[in-house]
Amino acid sequence: MIGLNPEMRLISPMLDRAVIDALFPADLPEAAHWERRYPSRQLPGSAQVTRFGPSPTGFVHIGGIYVAMIDRDIATHSRGVYLVRVEDTDTSREVAGALTQFARAFDYFGIRTDESDEHGRYGPYRQSARESIYLTYVRELLRQDKAYLCFATKDELADITARQQAAKIPTGYYGSWAIWRDADPAAVQTKLAEGAPYVVRFRAPDDAAGQRVRFTDVIRGELEHEANRNDTVILKSSDQSPRLPTYHFAHAVDDHLMRVTLVIRGEEWISSVPLHRQLFDALGFKPVTYAHIAPLMKQIPGGKRKLSKRADPEASVDFYIEAGYPSAAILYYLRGLANGRLAELPLSEALSTPIRLDQCGVAGPLVDLVKLDDISADYIATMSGPQILDAVRTWAAQFDPDLATVLDTEPDLALRALAVERDGVDNPRKDLHKWSDFRAAYGFFFPQLFTPLSGSTDERLLPLGVDATITASFAQDFADGYQHLDDPQEWFNQIRELAAKHGFAASVKEYKKNPDAYPGSIREASQLIRIALTGSTRSPDLHAITQTLGSAEVLRRLRTLSTGTA
C-alpha cells in the first residue's frame, strides 16, 4: 500500500511556504487582489443577492426553472441582484449544446440575469473561467495548514472503503484513515519530485467528530446536522487542466466574491451545509443564508416520488416549450406550487405578487399536468385572436413548419376561425391548452390541413351507425339544395327539414321509442354534416363554421360525403 500506514501516521509540521507557492503560477494574485476586485455591493439593507447555478451536464429540469424563478423573484422584490453562474467544473460530464438549451429556456420564461460577462463586474460567470481565483484561495488554505496535498490512489481509496465497510464504521477519508493528512513534508516532497498526481483536501477540524451543527434555513427554520469530519477534496487532480475545484469549494469562493447573500437550492444539499460552513469559516468568509427548496414530485400508484429526468418527459423544460405551453401559464402554475396563496389570485396579480420563502412548503409539491392544462386553457381564453395567432405562428415556425406556412398564407381565415365562439361571448372556447393543440382544434378550417371524407363509407362515419346509402343520399340532397344563410335557425332548418324527408326521427326521444323505424335521429343527421365539414363529431357551432369556411368550401366538403370526390 503506497503512502502512510494509518497505524503509523506522523504528526508533522506543515509544508514550507516556498514548496506550497511553487505548486502555483508565479504570477497568481493574492487573496487581497480578488477582494479589491470584487468589492461589497452597494445595495439597500434588505436587498438580497441570489444566484442560479445551472450545470451543463444535461437538459434543464423544470425544477431548475422553479428555483430560478424564485431566485429572480426574491432579488426583484428586495431590490437586489439576480445572477446566473454556470457551474461547469465537471468537464467530463458536460453535454454539447446544454448551454444553448439553458439560454433558450431562460429566455422562454423571461427569467433574465442582472449580470453577465458583458455587463457585470463580478464575473467571469462560468466557473471554468475562474481557475486563477480558486487557485489563490486553495494556496491560502495550504499556507495556513487548513488544506493538504493527498497522493492517495484510487486503489488505496477503494481499500480504505473496503476496510471501513468490513469494520462496519462510516466510510470516508477522515481521522486515521486520512493517510496524507499529517504526512511528513519530506514524504510529500518526494512524491512531488516523482511527479505523482495529487488532489488538495480540506483539513476538517480536529474536533469535528461527534459534533452537531445548528443553522437556520429560511424555509425550514432551525436545523441540526452532524458536523462534517471528512477531509473533502477541494481541488481536483494535478494531472488535469484546467485545475478546477469541486462544487463545495467553488460555492464558498464564488458566493463570497460575488457577494451572494441568499443561496436557494434543492433540499439534497442540506446535508452539505456543515461542510460549507467549515469552508466559509476556514476561508474567513461571512457565511451565506440558505433556503432549501423541496423538489417537484410526481404522483404514482401508492405514493409519490421526485420528478425524474430519466423516467418523466415532463421533467424536461423542452417538454413544455415543444408542446407550446404559454410561459405565463407555466410560471403562474409554478408560483402556485411555491406559495399556495398565489394559486388563488388572478394570473396577472399572481405573477406580480412577491413569493415568500416562509410560505414554501417542506414537502415536495406535485406536478399535475391536468391542472396545468386547465390553467393554460383559462389563460389562452383571455387572449385576443391576433395574440393567439401570433403565439401559434411563433411556436409553429420552430416545431410545425407546415402549419406555420399555412398560417402565413391564410392569416384572415385563421382569425375568423379563432373568432368562432370566442369573440363577443361571456364564456369563450377553451379548446387550446397549448399551441400544439391548434392543428387538432382548428386545422379543419384550412383546406390544406383538412382530409375530406372518402365517401359515405368513410371510417369517421362508422360511430353514427347510419346506413351508407342513406348517408350518401342525404348528403347529396343537402348539397343540391344548400343555402348559405346568415340566420343560424334558418340555416339549421335546412338540416331539420331534409332529415325528416329522409326518415330521421325529429328528436332523440322519438328515435329511442322505436329505433328500428328510423335510420337515426336529428342528432345523427346533424352529425353527418358535422363530420363532413370538420372530420369529427365534436366541433364548435356548425352554422358558425359554415360562415367561416364560406359557401364554396362547404359545398366541396358536402360533395365528398356523397361521392367521395369534391
Where are these regions (language model features)?
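Active-site cores that bind ATP or allylic diphosphates and position pyrophosphate for catalysis
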Residues: 148-292, 297-307, 316, 434, ...
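N-terminal Rossmann-like or analogous alpha/beta NTP/dinucleotide-binding catalytic cores
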Residues: 4-167, 242-244, 271-285, 329
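Catalytic adenosine-cofactor/nucleotide-binding cores of aminoacyl-tRNA synthetases and other
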Residues: 283-462, 534-566
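Short amphipathic alpha-helical segments and their helix-coil junctions
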Residues: 47-51, 83, 313, 349-357, ...
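Glycine- and acidic
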Residues: 50-57, 83-88, 257-263, 314-316, ...
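Residue-level signal for inorganic ion chemistry
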Residues: 71, 102, 141, 145, ...
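Helix-rich, typically C-terminal accessory recognition domains appended to large enzymatic cores
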Residues: 495-549, 553
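Residue patterns forming the tRNA-binding/recognition surfaces of aminoacyl-tRNA synthetases
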Residues: 135-140, 144-146, 198-199, 205, ...
